[in-house]
Curated annotation (Swiss-Prot):
One of its GO terms (molecular function) is proton-transporting ATP synthase activity, rotational mechanism. InterPro entries: ATP_synth_F1_esu_mt (IPR006721), ATP_synth_F1_esu_sf_mt (IPR036742). The lineage of its organism: Eukaryota, Fungi, Dikarya, Ascomycota, Saccharomycotina. Signal peptide: none annotated. This is ATP synthase subunit epsilon, mitochondrial. It comes from Pichia angusta (Yeast). It is a peripheral membrane protein. Mitochondrial membrane ATP synthase (F(1)F(0) ATP synthase or Complex V) produces ATP from ADP in the presence of a proton gradient across the membrane which is generated by electron transport complexes of the respiratory chain. F-type ATP synthases consist of two structural domains, F(1) - containing the extramembraneous catalytic core, and F(0) - containing the membrane proton channel, linked together by a central stalk and a peripheral stalk. It comes from the Eukaryota. It is found in: Mitochondrion inner membrane.
Amino acid sequence: SSWQKAGISFNKYLAIAARTVQRSLKNDLKVAAEKRYISDAKVQKLEKGNVVSTTDLASNKSA
C-alpha cells in the first residue's frame, strides 16, 4: 500500500487524509468538522470505588 511505501504508519496516513478532506470543505462544513475534534478529558481520583475528586485536564480546574 502507498502509506507503507511512504514509510508512515496507518494512523498517520488517516490523519493526513482527514486533514486533506477537512481543508477542502466549504467554510460552513469546515466549522462543523472542526467542532468534532474538540474533546474533553478529565481525571477522576477514586478511593474505595467512590470518586473523591475530578480534574478537568483542559483547564486544570478541580470539580
